[in-house]
């Protein structure tokens, strides 16, 4: 066989190998898409690396907020949060969650994280995976016209992973029923460390519920 007879064969082999790689790549992409869709359908949050921002503005503090599932929409809960002014953490640029008042006098603030309630003595309750909780960070909230110290926030209902809340008064039984505003354990630790550093605190004000508190 002459040398030139090999050229089509080599070309065919190269095209075949390239085609196999393309099919494998498409299968990998399809698998990732299916995993994301399945996670969303099951109510799971796909982890993403969030950047912390240090803000000073009015905000809603939901670290211990009680929440009630929204009628007709089990994926959302309505939470009653405190309106605060001062340093806080968010995972979007501060201007994105800047408070505002519309032409009708309706005041909008956003749920952001702060250490204030822990400094006031609230302790951190850890709850097991599978129990319902709400994720309020960065969510828009409407300030109560009858009580400007309170805001109503619409938060996501989740049942993923171990989570914490400053609500519940250390009563673990409420983890299954109360729909507390909470946070994933790792995110809470990361946010706490960030604020301690930004505020130049000597130590964190966070205290945890003890085994003796369980009931």
Each language-model region and where it sits:
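Sec/Tat signal peptide C-region and signal peptidase I cleavage site
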Residues: 44-50
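Enrichment for repetitive, rod-forming helical segments
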Residues: 9-10, 39, 114, 207
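Bacterial N-terminal signal peptides
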Residues: 13, 34-43
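Mitochondrial intermembrane space
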Residues: 50-215
């Amino acid at each position: 066989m002459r040398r030139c007879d090999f050229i089509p064969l080599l070309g065919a082999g190269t095209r075949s190998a390239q085609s196999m790689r393309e099919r494998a790549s498409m299968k990998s992409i399809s698998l990732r898409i299916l995993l994301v869709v399945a996670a969303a359908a099951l109510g799971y949050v796909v982890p993403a690396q969030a950047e912390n921002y240090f803000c000073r503005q009015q905000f809603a503090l939901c670290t211990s907020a009680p929440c009630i599932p929204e009628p007709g929409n089990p994926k959302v809960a309505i939470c009653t949060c405190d309106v605060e002014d001062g340093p806080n953490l968010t995972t979007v640029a501060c201007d994105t969650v800047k408070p505002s008042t519309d032409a009708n006098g309706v005041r909008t603030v956003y749920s952001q994280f702060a250490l204030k309630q822990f400094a006031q003595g609230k302790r951190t309750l850890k709850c097991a995976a599978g129990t319902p909780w709400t994720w309020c960070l960065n969510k828009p909230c409407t300030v109560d016209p009858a009580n400007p110290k309170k805001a109503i926030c619409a938060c996501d209902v989740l049942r993923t992973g171990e989570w914490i809340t400053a609500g519940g008064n250390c009563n673990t039984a409420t983890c299954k029923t109360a729909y507390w505003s909470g946070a994933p354990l790792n995110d809470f630790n990361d946010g706490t460390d960030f604020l301690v550093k930004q505020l130049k605190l000597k130590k964190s004000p966070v205290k945890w519920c003890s085994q003796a508190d369980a009931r």
